[in-house]
Regions:
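Gly/Ser/Thr-rich loops at beta-strand to alpha-helix junctions
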Residues: 135-144, 215-222, 360-367, 449-456
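C-terminal regions of proteins
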Residues: 419, 462, 466, 472-518
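Proline-aspartate-enriched helix->loop->beta-strand connector
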Residues: 208, 435, 439-445
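Active-site and donor-binding regions of nucleotide-sugar-utilizing enzymes
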Residues: 161-252, 474-476
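Short, surface-exposed basic-aromatic patches at helix termini and helix-loop junctions that form
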Residues: 148-150, 226-234, 372-377, 459-471
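Extended, charge-rich low-complexity interaction segments
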Residues: 189-205, 265-284, 409-432, 501-520
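A charged, amphipathic alpha-helical module
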Residues: 2, 7-8, 12-134, 256, ...
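Redox- and metal-dependent alpha/beta enzyme cores, enriched for Fe-S-associated oxidoreductases
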Residues: 129-131, 139-178, 360-432, 436
Length: 520
Protein backbone atom coordinates (compact mmCIF):
# COMPACT_ATOMS: atom_id res chain seq x y z
CA UNK A 1 0.00 0.00 0.00
CA UNK A 2 1.26 3.46 -0.90
CA UNK A 3 2.79 5.56 1.89
CA UNK A 4 1.67 9.18 2.19
CA UNK A 5 3.58 12.09 3.66
CA UNK A 6 2.04 15.10 5.38
CA UNK A 7 2.70 18.43 3.74
CA UNK A 8 4.56 21.20 5.56
CA UNK A 9 4.23 21.26 9.34
CA UNK A 10 0.85 19.53 9.42
CA UNK A 11 0.66 16.69 11.90
CA UNK A 12 -2.72 15.21 11.08
CA UNK A 13 -5.47 13.93 13.36
CA UNK A 14 -3.58 10.72 14.20
CA UNK A 15 -0.93 12.75 16.04
CA UNK A 16 -3.54 13.32 18.76
CA UNK A 17 -4.11 9.57 19.22
CA UNK A 18 -2.15 7.46 21.66
CA UNK A 19 -0.37 4.54 20.03
CA UNK A 20 -2.27 1.24 20.11
CA UNK A 21 -5.19 2.58 22.21
CA UNK A 22 -6.09 5.54 19.95
CA UNK A 23 -7.31 7.44 23.02
CA UNK A 24 -7.14 11.18 22.41
CA UNK A 25 -4.15 12.86 24.06
CA UNK A 26 -6.14 16.09 24.50
CA UNK A 27 -9.43 17.65 23.43
CA UNK A 28 -9.75 17.92 19.65
CA UNK A 29 -9.30 21.46 18.31
CA UNK A 30 -12.24 22.39 16.09
CA UNK A 31 -11.98 26.17 16.08
CA UNK A 32 -13.02 28.42 19.02
CA UNK A 33 -16.81 28.02 18.83
CA UNK A 34 -16.98 24.30 18.09
CA UNK A 35 -14.25 23.45 20.60
CA UNK A 36 -16.06 25.38 23.33
CA UNK A 37 -19.41 23.76 22.45
CA UNK A 38 -17.87 20.30 22.40
CA UNK A 39 -16.21 20.88 25.77
CA UNK A 40 -19.44 22.13 27.38
CA UNK A 41 -21.35 19.08 26.10
CA UNK A 42 -18.53 16.84 27.36
CA UNK A 43 -18.92 18.47 30.79
CA UNK A 44 -22.68 17.93 30.54
CA UNK A 45 -22.04 14.23 29.91
CA UNK A 46 -19.86 14.02 33.00
CA UNK A 47 -22.64 15.69 34.97
CA UNK A 48 -25.09 12.99 33.81
CA UNK A 49 -22.66 10.21 34.75
CA UNK A 50 -21.72 11.68 38.14
CA UNK A 51 -25.37 12.26 39.02
CA UNK A 52 -26.13 8.63 38.17
CA UNK A 53 -23.14 7.25 40.09
CA UNK A 54 -23.90 9.35 43.17
CA UNK A 55 -27.62 8.55 43.24
CA UNK A 56 -27.08 4.89 44.25
CA UNK A 57 -23.35 4.54 44.96
CA UNK A 58 -23.42 1.19 46.77
CA UNK A 59 -25.74 -0.41 44.24
CA UNK A 60 -23.68 0.86 41.29
CA UNK A 61 -20.40 -0.36 42.80
CA UNK A 62 -22.01 -3.78 43.34
CA UNK A 63 -23.04 -3.83 39.68
CA UNK A 64 -19.53 -2.96 38.48
CA UNK A 65 -18.04 -5.82 40.51
CA UNK A 66 -20.84 -8.30 39.68
CA UNK A 67 -20.95 -7.81 35.90
CA UNK A 68 -17.92 -7.91 33.63
CA UNK A 69 -19.73 -5.86 30.95
CA UNK A 70 -20.29 -2.96 33.36
CA UNK A 71 -16.63 -1.97 33.09
CA UNK A 72 -17.31 -0.93 29.49
CA UNK A 73 -19.67 1.80 30.67
CA UNK A 74 -16.78 3.42 32.55
CA UNK A 75 -15.28 4.36 29.17
CA UNK A 76 -18.35 6.16 27.80
CA UNK A 77 -16.73 9.65 27.66
CA UNK A 78 -13.98 8.30 25.41
CA UNK A 79 -16.58 6.45 23.32
CA UNK A 80 -18.59 9.63 22.74
CA UNK A 81 -15.40 11.48 21.78
CA UNK A 82 -14.70 8.84 19.12
CA UNK A 83 -18.23 9.19 17.72
CA UNK A 84 -17.68 12.95 17.36
CA UNK A 85 -14.17 12.84 15.85
CA UNK A 86 -13.72 15.45 13.15
CA UNK A 87 -17.26 16.81 13.38
CA UNK A 88 -17.99 20.51 13.11
CA UNK A 89 -21.00 22.82 13.09
CA UNK A 90 -24.49 21.32 13.14
CA UNK A 91 -23.15 17.78 12.82
CA UNK A 92 -21.20 18.16 16.05
CA UNK A 93 -24.10 19.81 17.87
CA UNK A 94 -26.61 17.23 16.71
CA UNK A 95 -24.31 14.36 17.66
CA UNK A 96 -23.55 15.69 21.14
CA UNK A 97 -27.22 16.35 21.93
CA UNK A 98 -28.27 12.91 20.69
CA UNK A 99 -25.51 11.16 22.61
CA UNK A 100 -26.15 13.03 25.85
CA UNK A 101 -29.85 12.21 25.65
CA UNK A 102 -28.88 8.57 25.11
CA UNK A 103 -26.60 8.72 28.18
CA UNK A 104 -29.37 10.27 30.28
CA UNK A 105 -31.91 7.60 29.33
CA UNK A 106 -29.48 4.68 29.66
CA UNK A 107 -28.39 5.71 33.16
CA UNK A 108 -32.03 5.96 34.26
CA UNK A 109 -32.73 2.50 32.87
CA UNK A 110 -29.63 1.04 34.52
CA UNK A 111 -30.89 2.44 37.84
CA UNK A 112 -34.24 0.70 37.26
CA UNK A 113 -32.48 -2.56 36.37
CA UNK A 114 -30.08 -2.58 39.29
CA UNK A 115 -32.76 -1.53 41.79
CA UNK A 116 -34.71 -4.67 40.91
CA UNK A 117 -31.79 -7.02 40.22
CA UNK A 118 -32.03 -10.03 42.52
CA UNK A 119 -28.33 -10.73 41.91
CA UNK A 120 -27.54 -7.45 43.64
CA UNK A 121 -30.39 -7.61 46.18
CA UNK A 122 -30.92 -11.31 47.05
CA UNK A 123 -34.02 -11.83 49.18
CA UNK A 124 -35.06 -8.16 48.95
CA UNK A 125 -38.83 -7.60 49.14
CA UNK A 126 -38.45 -4.16 47.56
CA UNK A 127 -36.64 -5.65 44.58
CA UNK A 128 -39.33 -8.34 44.24
CA UNK A 129 -42.03 -5.66 44.17
CA UNK A 130 -40.15 -3.67 41.55
CA UNK A 131 -39.83 -6.76 39.37
CA UNK A 132 -43.60 -7.11 39.23
CA UNK A 133 -43.61 -3.92 37.15
CA UNK A 134 -40.76 -4.80 34.78
CA UNK A 135 -41.45 -6.46 31.43
CA UNK A 136 -38.41 -7.92 29.69
CA UNK A 137 -38.38 -8.07 25.89
CA UNK A 138 -35.86 -9.23 23.33
CA UNK A 139 -33.69 -6.29 22.27
CA UNK A 140 -34.87 -6.57 18.66
CA UNK A 141 -38.50 -6.09 19.68
CA UNK A 142 -39.21 -2.33 19.84
CA UNK A 143 -40.73 -1.40 23.18
CA UNK A 144 -43.54 0.77 21.79
CA UNK A 145 -46.04 -1.94 22.80
CA UNK A 146 -45.06 -1.21 26.40
CA UNK A 147 -46.77 2.19 26.19
CA UNK A 148 -50.01 0.28 26.64
CA UNK A 149 -48.84 -0.69 30.13
CA UNK A 150 -48.05 2.74 31.67
CA UNK A 151 -47.72 1.22 35.13
CA UNK A 152 -44.85 -1.00 33.97
CA UNK A 153 -41.38 -0.47 32.55
CA UNK A 154 -40.56 -2.42 29.39
CA UNK A 155 -36.81 -3.11 29.17
CA UNK A 156 -34.84 -4.42 26.20
CA UNK A 157 -33.26 -7.35 27.98
CA UNK A 158 -30.01 -7.72 26.01
CA UNK A 159 -29.57 -4.05 25.10
CA UNK A 160 -27.71 -2.99 28.25
CA UNK A 161 -25.47 -6.01 29.02
CA UNK A 162 -24.77 -6.90 25.39
CA UNK A 163 -25.52 -4.46 22.57
CA UNK A 164 -24.34 -1.16 24.06
CA UNK A 165 -21.14 -2.62 25.61
CA UNK A 166 -20.23 -4.12 22.23
CA UNK A 167 -20.30 -0.62 20.75
CA UNK A 168 -18.51 1.10 23.62
CA UNK A 169 -15.67 -1.40 24.00
CA UNK A 170 -14.67 -3.59 21.06
CA UNK A 171 -13.18 -6.22 23.39
CA UNK A 172 -16.27 -6.66 25.59
CA UNK A 173 -17.82 -9.48 23.47
CA UNK A 174 -14.66 -11.62 23.26
CA UNK A 175 -14.89 -13.31 26.67
CA UNK A 176 -18.57 -14.21 26.23
CA UNK A 177 -18.10 -15.47 22.67
CA UNK A 178 -15.29 -17.71 23.93
CA UNK A 179 -17.52 -19.03 26.73
CA UNK A 180 -20.27 -19.97 24.28
CA UNK A 181 -17.76 -21.83 22.11
CA UNK A 182 -16.28 -23.62 25.13
CA UNK A 183 -19.84 -24.63 26.01
CA UNK A 184 -20.05 -26.38 22.65
CA UNK A 185 -21.87 -23.89 20.45
CA UNK A 186 -20.64 -23.55 16.84
CA UNK A 187 -17.77 -21.13 16.33
CA UNK A 188 -19.04 -19.92 12.94
CA UNK A 189 -22.34 -18.49 14.16
CA UNK A 190 -22.94 -14.72 14.19
CA UNK A 191 -21.20 -13.05 17.17
CA UNK A 192 -24.46 -11.41 18.30
CA UNK A 193 -26.24 -14.62 19.40
CA UNK A 194 -22.88 -16.01 20.57
CA UNK A 195 -22.46 -13.00 22.85
CA UNK A 196 -26.01 -13.46 24.19
CA UNK A 197 -25.42 -17.17 24.79
CA UNK A 198 -22.16 -16.44 26.60
CA UNK A 199 -23.92 -13.97 28.89
CA UNK A 200 -26.50 -16.62 29.76
CA UNK A 201 -23.84 -19.29 30.34
CA UNK A 202 -21.89 -16.93 32.62
CA UNK A 203 -25.12 -15.93 34.40
CA UNK A 204 -24.31 -12.31 33.59
CA UNK A 205 -27.81 -11.15 32.70
CA UNK A 206 -29.45 -9.13 35.50
CA UNK A 207 -32.12 -11.16 37.29
CA UNK A 208 -35.13 -8.92 36.69
CA UNK A 209 -38.71 -8.89 35.44
CA UNK A 210 -42.02 -10.67 35.84
CA UNK A 211 -42.14 -12.10 32.30
CA UNK A 212 -40.41 -11.92 28.95
CA UNK A 213 -41.32 -11.55 25.29
CA UNK A 214 -38.84 -13.32 23.03
CA UNK A 215 -38.62 -13.18 19.26
CA UNK A 216 -37.64 -14.99 16.07
CA UNK A 217 -35.60 -11.94 15.02
CA UNK A 218 -33.25 -11.47 13.31
CA UNK A 219 -32.03 -14.95 12.32
CA UNK A 220 -31.84 -18.65 13.18
CA UNK A 221 -28.79 -18.05 15.37
CA UNK A 222 -30.83 -15.75 17.60
CA UNK A 223 -33.67 -18.26 17.76
CA UNK A 224 -31.27 -20.93 19.01
CA UNK A 225 -29.69 -18.69 21.64
CA UNK A 226 -33.16 -17.68 22.86
CA UNK A 227 -33.76 -21.28 23.94
CA UNK A 228 -30.53 -21.23 25.94
CA UNK A 229 -31.38 -17.87 27.51
CA UNK A 230 -34.86 -19.03 28.53
CA UNK A 231 -33.41 -21.94 30.49
CA UNK A 232 -31.05 -19.62 32.36
CA UNK A 233 -33.36 -16.67 32.91
CA UNK A 234 -36.28 -18.74 34.19
CA UNK A 235 -39.12 -16.28 33.49
CA UNK A 236 -42.56 -16.94 32.00
CA UNK A 237 -42.00 -16.25 28.31
CA UNK A 238 -43.80 -16.08 25.01
CA UNK A 239 -42.45 -15.74 21.49
CA UNK A 240 -43.69 -12.78 19.48
CA UNK A 241 -43.19 -14.20 16.00
CA UNK A 242 -42.62 -11.73 13.19
CA UNK A 243 -43.37 -12.85 9.60
CA UNK A 244 -40.37 -13.25 7.32
CA UNK A 245 -42.16 -12.14 4.15
CA UNK A 246 -43.45 -8.95 5.73
CA UNK A 247 -44.06 -7.21 2.38
CA UNK A 248 -46.93 -9.58 1.60
CA UNK A 249 -50.50 -8.65 2.54
CA UNK A 250 -51.33 -12.28 3.33
CA UNK A 251 -49.20 -12.30 6.49
CA UNK A 252 -50.57 -9.13 8.09
CA UNK A 253 -53.47 -10.80 9.89
CA UNK A 254 -51.00 -13.27 11.37
CA UNK A 255 -48.73 -10.40 12.47
CA UNK A 256 -51.65 -8.63 14.17
CA UNK A 257 -52.62 -11.88 15.87
CA UNK A 258 -49.12 -12.15 17.33
CA UNK A 259 -49.40 -8.63 18.79
CA UNK A 260 -52.83 -9.41 20.26
CA UNK A 261 -51.55 -12.63 21.79
CA UNK A 262 -48.57 -10.78 23.28
CA UNK A 263 -50.91 -8.23 24.88
CA UNK A 264 -52.95 -11.03 26.48
CA UNK A 265 -49.76 -12.66 27.77
CA UNK A 266 -48.55 -9.39 29.32
CA UNK A 267 -51.95 -8.68 30.90
CA UNK A 268 -51.85 -12.09 32.54
CA UNK A 269 -48.38 -11.72 34.04
CA UNK A 270 -48.45 -8.03 34.98
CA UNK A 271 -51.98 -8.08 36.36
CA UNK A 272 -52.70 -4.87 34.46
CA UNK A 273 -55.25 -4.13 31.77
CA UNK A 274 -53.93 -2.88 28.46
CA UNK A 275 -54.45 0.90 28.18
CA UNK A 276 -55.40 1.79 24.61
CA UNK A 277 -55.43 5.53 25.31
CA UNK A 278 -51.86 5.39 26.62
CA UNK A 279 -50.83 3.38 23.56
CA UNK A 280 -52.44 5.97 21.28
CA UNK A 281 -50.53 8.76 23.01
CA UNK A 282 -47.26 6.85 22.66
CA UNK A 283 -47.90 6.09 18.97
CA UNK A 284 -48.67 9.74 18.22
CA UNK A 285 -45.42 10.82 19.88
CA UNK A 286 -43.59 8.15 17.89
CA UNK A 287 -45.14 9.45 14.67
CA UNK A 288 -43.71 12.89 15.44
CA UNK A 289 -40.33 11.33 16.22
CA UNK A 290 -40.45 9.55 12.88
CA UNK A 291 -41.37 12.78 11.07
CA UNK A 292 -38.29 14.36 12.63
CA UNK A 293 -36.23 11.53 11.16
CA UNK A 294 -37.83 12.04 7.75
CA UNK A 295 -36.64 15.66 7.93
CA UNK A 296 -33.10 14.51 8.68
CA UNK A 297 -33.18 12.21 5.66
CA UNK A 298 -34.39 15.10 3.48
CA UNK A 299 -31.56 17.30 4.74
CA UNK A 300 -29.03 14.58 3.95
CA UNK A 301 -30.24 14.58 0.35
CA UNK A 302 -29.00 18.17 -0.03
CA UNK A 303 -25.48 19.27 -0.94
CA UNK A 304 -24.87 19.96 2.77
CA UNK A 305 -25.73 16.68 4.56
CA UNK A 306 -25.70 17.71 8.25
CA UNK A 307 -26.83 14.56 10.07
CA UNK A 308 -24.20 11.93 9.35
CA UNK A 309 -21.50 10.04 11.19
CA UNK A 310 -21.76 7.06 13.49
CA UNK A 311 -23.89 8.80 16.11
CA UNK A 312 -26.70 9.23 13.53
CA UNK A 313 -27.39 5.52 13.01
CA UNK A 314 -26.68 4.65 16.64
CA UNK A 315 -29.25 7.18 17.85
CA UNK A 316 -31.82 5.99 15.30
CA UNK A 317 -31.50 2.39 16.50
CA UNK A 318 -31.78 3.43 20.14
CA UNK A 319 -34.75 5.69 19.47
CA UNK A 320 -36.64 3.10 17.43
CA UNK A 321 -36.03 0.26 19.86
CA UNK A 322 -35.80 1.80 23.34
CA UNK A 323 -37.43 5.25 23.46
CA UNK A 324 -40.18 5.20 20.84
CA UNK A 325 -43.08 7.25 22.17
CA UNK A 326 -40.97 9.07 24.78
CA UNK A 327 -41.73 12.84 25.10
CA UNK A 328 -38.14 13.66 26.10
CA UNK A 329 -36.81 11.91 23.00
CA UNK A 330 -39.17 13.96 20.83
CA UNK A 331 -38.03 17.15 22.58
CA UNK A 332 -34.42 16.27 21.74
CA UNK A 333 -35.35 15.50 18.12
CA UNK A 334 -37.04 18.87 17.65
CA UNK A 335 -34.03 20.67 19.14
CA UNK A 336 -31.56 18.82 16.91
CA UNK A 337 -33.65 19.43 13.79
CA UNK A 338 -33.68 23.18 14.43
CA UNK A 339 -29.88 23.10 14.59
CA UNK A 340 -29.61 21.08 11.35
CA UNK A 341 -32.11 23.22 9.42
CA UNK A 342 -30.25 26.38 10.38
CA UNK A 343 -26.95 25.17 8.92
CA UNK A 344 -28.52 24.00 5.66
CA UNK A 345 -30.46 27.28 5.31
CA UNK A 346 -27.21 29.23 5.75
CA UNK A 347 -25.51 27.10 3.11
CA UNK A 348 -22.59 26.25 5.37
CA UNK A 349 -20.65 22.99 5.01
CA UNK A 350 -17.88 22.83 7.63
CA UNK A 351 -16.30 19.61 6.31
CA UNK A 352 -14.45 18.30 3.28
CA UNK A 353 -16.74 16.03 1.25
CA UNK A 354 -15.30 14.28 -1.80
CA UNK A 355 -17.73 11.41 -2.05
CA UNK A 356 -21.32 10.71 -1.04
CA UNK A 357 -21.58 7.06 -0.03
CA UNK A 358 -24.40 4.67 0.73
CA UNK A 359 -23.34 2.21 3.45
CA UNK A 360 -25.18 -1.10 3.11
CA UNK A 361 -25.63 -4.14 5.33
CA UNK A 362 -25.26 -4.14 9.12
CA UNK A 363 -22.44 -1.91 10.42
CA UNK A 364 -19.64 -3.21 12.61
CA UNK A 365 -20.29 -2.81 16.34
CA UNK A 366 -16.65 -3.14 17.28
CA UNK A 367 -15.80 -0.19 15.01
CA UNK A 368 -18.68 2.13 15.78
CA UNK A 369 -16.83 5.28 14.64
CA UNK A 370 -15.94 3.86 11.22
CA UNK A 371 -18.11 6.52 9.53
CA UNK A 372 -16.05 9.27 11.16
CA UNK A 373 -12.81 7.73 9.90
CA UNK A 374 -14.20 7.52 6.34
CA UNK A 375 -14.89 11.25 6.31
CA UNK A 376 -11.79 12.39 8.14
CA UNK A 377 -9.35 10.24 6.16
CA UNK A 378 -10.85 10.05 2.67
CA UNK A 379 -13.64 12.64 2.60
CA UNK A 380 -16.30 9.93 2.22
CA UNK A 381 -19.58 11.15 3.72
CA UNK A 382 -22.09 8.44 4.70
CA UNK A 383 -25.23 10.23 3.50
CA UNK A 384 -27.36 7.09 3.75
CA UNK A 385 -26.95 3.96 5.85
CA UNK A 386 -29.09 0.84 5.68
CA UNK A 387 -29.26 0.37 9.46
CA UNK A 388 -30.67 3.90 9.73
CA UNK A 389 -33.62 3.15 7.43
CA UNK A 390 -36.34 1.21 9.22
CA UNK A 391 -39.77 1.81 10.72
CA UNK A 392 -40.61 4.32 7.98
CA UNK A 393 -44.41 4.11 8.17
CA UNK A 394 -46.51 6.28 10.47
CA UNK A 395 -49.02 4.52 12.73
CA UNK A 396 -52.70 5.24 12.15
CA UNK A 397 -54.16 5.94 15.61
CA UNK A 398 -57.77 6.38 14.51
CA UNK A 399 -58.87 2.99 15.89
CA UNK A 400 -57.62 0.02 17.88
CA UNK A 401 -57.49 -2.10 14.76
CA UNK A 402 -55.41 0.47 12.88
CA UNK A 403 -53.01 0.79 15.82
CA UNK A 404 -52.56 -2.98 15.94
CA UNK A 405 -51.76 -3.03 12.24
CA UNK A 406 -49.38 -0.12 12.69
CA UNK A 407 -47.64 -1.90 15.57
CA UNK A 408 -47.38 -5.08 13.49
CA UNK A 409 -45.70 -3.09 10.72
CA UNK A 410 -43.47 -1.36 13.28
CA UNK A 411 -42.22 -4.75 14.51
CA UNK A 412 -41.81 -6.19 11.03
CA UNK A 413 -39.64 -3.28 9.91
CA UNK A 414 -37.49 -2.96 13.01
CA UNK A 415 -33.70 -2.88 13.35
CA UNK A 416 -31.84 -5.67 11.51
CA UNK A 417 -35.16 -6.76 10.07
CA UNK A 418 -36.47 -4.22 7.56
CA UNK A 419 -33.91 -5.16 4.90
CA UNK A 420 -32.56 -8.57 5.87
CA UNK A 421 -36.06 -10.11 5.74
CA UNK A 422 -38.94 -9.54 3.37
CA UNK A 423 -37.57 -10.65 0.02
CA UNK A 424 -34.77 -9.52 -2.26
CA UNK A 425 -36.48 -6.24 -3.15
CA UNK A 426 -35.98 -4.79 0.35
CA UNK A 427 -32.27 -5.66 0.45
CA UNK A 428 -31.19 -5.55 -3.18
CA UNK A 429 -33.54 -3.22 -5.07
CA UNK A 430 -33.69 -0.76 -2.19
CA UNK A 431 -29.91 -0.22 -2.44
CA UNK A 432 -30.09 1.09 -6.00
CA UNK A 433 -33.08 3.26 -5.10
CA UNK A 434 -31.26 4.86 -2.16
CA UNK A 435 -28.15 5.35 -4.28
CA UNK A 436 -30.13 7.52 -6.70
CA UNK A 437 -32.25 9.14 -4.02
CA UNK A 438 -29.26 10.46 -2.05
CA UNK A 439 -27.24 11.43 -5.15
CA UNK A 440 -24.45 9.08 -4.07
CA UNK A 441 -21.33 8.30 -6.09
CA UNK A 442 -20.11 5.14 -4.35
CA UNK A 443 -21.27 2.22 -2.18
CA UNK A 444 -19.58 0.76 0.87
CA UNK A 445 -20.77 -2.81 1.33
CA UNK A 446 -20.19 -4.36 4.74
CA UNK A 447 -19.23 -8.00 4.29
CA UNK A 448 -20.27 -9.50 7.62
CA UNK A 449 -18.42 -12.78 7.33
CA UNK A 450 -20.60 -14.69 9.84
CA UNK A 451 -23.95 -13.67 8.32
CA UNK A 452 -25.13 -16.52 6.14
CA UNK A 453 -28.28 -14.76 4.89
CA UNK A 454 -26.73 -11.69 3.30
CA UNK A 455 -23.65 -13.66 2.30
CA UNK A 456 -25.85 -15.68 -0.05
CA UNK A 457 -26.55 -12.64 -2.25
CA UNK A 458 -23.10 -11.00 -2.26
CA UNK A 459 -22.70 -11.87 -5.92
CA UNK A 460 -25.95 -10.11 -6.80
CA UNK A 461 -24.69 -6.90 -5.21
CA UNK A 462 -21.47 -7.09 -7.21
CA UNK A 463 -23.30 -7.81 -10.47
CA UNK A 464 -25.72 -4.95 -9.85
CA UNK A 465 -22.95 -2.47 -9.13
CA UNK A 466 -20.95 -3.52 -12.21
CA UNK A 467 -24.04 -3.30 -14.41
CA UNK A 468 -24.74 0.25 -13.22
CA UNK A 469 -21.11 1.37 -13.23
CA UNK A 470 -21.16 2.12 -9.49
CA UNK A 471 -17.88 2.04 -7.53
CA UNK A 472 -18.45 -0.39 -4.65
CA UNK A 473 -15.91 -1.37 -2.00
CA UNK A 474 -16.45 -4.47 0.10
CA UNK A 475 -15.38 -3.98 3.73
CA UNK A 476 -14.96 -7.18 5.71
CA UNK A 477 -16.14 -7.25 9.33
CA UNK A 478 -17.53 -9.67 11.90
CA UNK A 479 -20.08 -7.47 13.69
CA UNK A 480 -18.97 -7.96 17.32
CA UNK A 481 -15.83 -10.09 17.11
CA UNK A 482 -12.60 -8.05 16.73
CA UNK A 483 -10.50 -11.22 16.73
CA UNK A 484 -11.77 -12.20 13.26
CA UNK A 485 -11.45 -8.89 11.41
CA UNK A 486 -9.65 -5.99 13.07
CA UNK A 487 -10.36 -2.29 12.65
CA UNK A 488 -7.07 -1.90 10.80
CA UNK A 489 -8.12 -4.57 8.30
CA UNK A 490 -11.42 -2.77 7.72
CA UNK A 491 -9.58 0.49 7.07
CA UNK A 492 -7.14 -1.30 4.79
CA UNK A 493 -9.98 -2.55 2.59
CA UNK A 494 -11.00 1.07 2.01
CA UNK A 495 -7.41 2.32 1.67
CA UNK A 496 -6.57 -0.17 -1.07
CA UNK A 497 -9.81 0.57 -2.93
CA UNK A 498 -9.40 4.35 -2.77
CA UNK A 499 -5.80 4.14 -4.01
CA UNK A 500 -6.04 1.40 -6.63
CA UNK A 501 -9.58 1.86 -7.96
CA UNK A 502 -10.41 5.51 -7.27
CA UNK A 503 -6.77 6.65 -7.72
CA UNK A 504 -7.08 9.21 -4.91
CA UNK A 505 -4.98 10.59 -2.11
CA UNK A 506 -6.36 10.92 1.43
CA UNK A 507 -7.65 14.12 2.98
CA UNK A 508 -5.59 13.30 6.10
CA UNK A 509 -2.67 10.93 5.33
CA UNK A 510 -1.97 10.41 9.03
CA UNK A 511 -5.19 8.39 9.33
CA UNK A 512 -4.38 5.91 6.57
CA UNK A 513 -2.35 3.63 8.84
CA UNK A 514 -2.33 3.69 12.63
CA UNK A 515 -2.52 1.12 15.42
CA UNK A 516 -5.69 0.99 17.54
CA UNK A 517 -5.90 -2.75 18.23
CA UNK A 518 -5.91 -2.14 21.99
CA UNK A 519 -8.51 0.59 21.80
CA UNK A 520 -11.78 0.30 23.68
Amino acid sequence: MKKFKLKGKAKGAASNLQDKTAIQKHREWRGPQDTAYDYLQWCRLWGILIKWAASHPVQNVKAVWRYRWMFSYLTVPSFFDRLCEGQRGAGLRGARNNLNYLASDVTKTLTTIFSADMHLHPGSKKAEERNKKIICVDELLPNLLGKGFPGCKMILFQEYPMYLPSLINQHSPVHYIEQSELYGLPADVCPLPSFEAGLAIEDDFPKIGCCMLTSNMPCDGSIMTTMLQERRIDLPSQVLNVPLRWKEDEVQDYAVGEITSAIEFLEKHTGQKFDWDALKEGCEIWNKQNECKFEKWDLNRTDIPPHTGSSAWLYRIFEHQAVAGEPLALKNDLKVNRILHKQVAEGKCPKTIRHRAVLWNTPCNNYANFNNWLLNCWGIESVCEMIDIHGEDLIDTSSRESMLRGLADHYQTSTMRAHTKGGSEVMLDSLWEKYEEYNADMIIMFDQISCKGVGAINGLFEEGAMKRGIPMVRVRQDLMDPTSITRREMRNDVNVFMQSVMNEEPVDPSLVEFDDDQSW
